[in-house]
Amino acid sequence: MAIEDGSGIPFDAWRLVGGLEVALDVDVLFGAYPDRDGPPGAPEQVLRLLGGHRIRAAAVASLRAALFDVRSGNDELIAHAAPEVVPVGVVDLRDPVGAARELERLAAEGVRAVRLFPDEQGVEAGFPSVRHVARRAARLGLVVLTGGDVRRFWQPFAGLGADVVFLDTHFYHLGDFLVAAADEPGFHTSTRLLNSPDALELAAAELGAGRLLYGSRAPHYEPLVPLLRLATSGLKPEEIAAVAGGNAERLLRRPQS
């Protein structure tokens, strides 16, 4: 290796990221997972991490709400709301009746989105509770951010006219998302796991860059990886800006009708 040809220079991801900033990250969590190693997820620590990665605002959900107590976790998050935090409500899919009531309460509080944690709550896409919550969220005009395998979790939202962001779309399963989303204009995906050489470009070519939203899952995943993939993609500058927050702003900060 030689310095002259650049091969001996250490890899500098930030040099490749350049001036890219994220206006709104669609996948951020406050709190910790009690059953795994990881950061405590204190709000001030998470916001500091985001700032260090040029992420100016985030759609944030509470792991306390997802894993322990829905209402107190949601209330704690709503109380923390700041310009850089878009609060995202959480419901318990194991309690569909209570979940529907919580959706009504969240909507009345002005919350614009709800996040589903099917894997953490042990709920499968075919359970009646998921379809029930999907219908109620659509009726209330709430944007749904959902985990789970997109090959299964697209089904409960089909035909509802809902705005849904699939947070766990892996590039292995991108084709399934593309064919499902072709008939559902409200289907969107996080870019967190679309880190193959052509996943972003393929999705933009098939559906338009308006269906892609930058997501990091900070602080439990590394924000730099999807940031680097977006910065080095073959998308046009205006498409990159849309993915880096413009699309999320359109969904999550639009005026309520």
For the regions a protein language model found, what residue spans apply to each?
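Active-site environment of divalent metal-dependent phosphoester hydrolases
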Residues: 31-33, 65-69, 94-97, 121, ...
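Conserved, mostly hydrophobic/aromatic
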Residues: 27, 50, 77, 106, ...
